Amino acid sequence: MKFHRIVVLIDADNTNLANLEKLIQYISTRGRIVVKRAYGNWSENLKDKKSALQQSGFKTEHYFNCVPGKNATDIALAIDAVDLLHKNSYDSFVIVSSDSDFTPLSIYLKESGVYVIGFGKSNASEAFRNGCDEFKDI
């Protein structure tokens, strides 16, 4: 299936980006990527990821840890996804994460008429996998 306007949203806190270029190349074969955003706490162990993402044309969104081990990355990604859905006419959303918290978002996007592709680790939850139209291991 080919798409005209693809949104790529990366949960950098919960994603291995060792194959970022291959991931982007694959998504590009599916259509035109018009939005690239990545979310995470870049001040800690994600500094190298931030640089790689920026070099690949991603807008990097920074969220501090409010309490140890927790930040607003997930909710920020979800808010942006819903905001983008209602402001523009995108036909596909790509969510790169292994976090099952994105299951309700993937279902909401599907119910709103867009095609949802998930990318994540092989141990990503069945709920998130099944919430997407398709899911690929990275």
Where are these regions (language model features)?
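Domain-level signal for Mg2+-assisted phosphodiester chemistry and nucleotide/NA-binding surfaces
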Residues: 1-86, 107-110, 115, 123, ...
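General alpha-helical segment detector with a strong preference for membrane-spanning helices
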Residues: 15-17, 103, 137
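Acidic beta-strand-to-loop metal/phosphate-binding motif
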Residues: 39, 91-98, 105, 109, ...
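Short hydrophobic alpha-helical runs that function as membrane-insertion/retention elements
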Residues: 60-62, 94, 117-118, 136-137
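Short beta->alpha linker loops
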Residues: 72, 97-100, 120-123
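A short acidic, glycine/proline-enriched capping/turn motif at secondary-structure boundaries
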Residues: 84, 100-102
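Class I SAM-dependent methyltransferase SAM-binding "motif I" and its flanking Rossmann-like core
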Residues: 128, 137-138
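Receiver (REC) domain switch/active-site residues of two-component response regulators
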Residues: 133
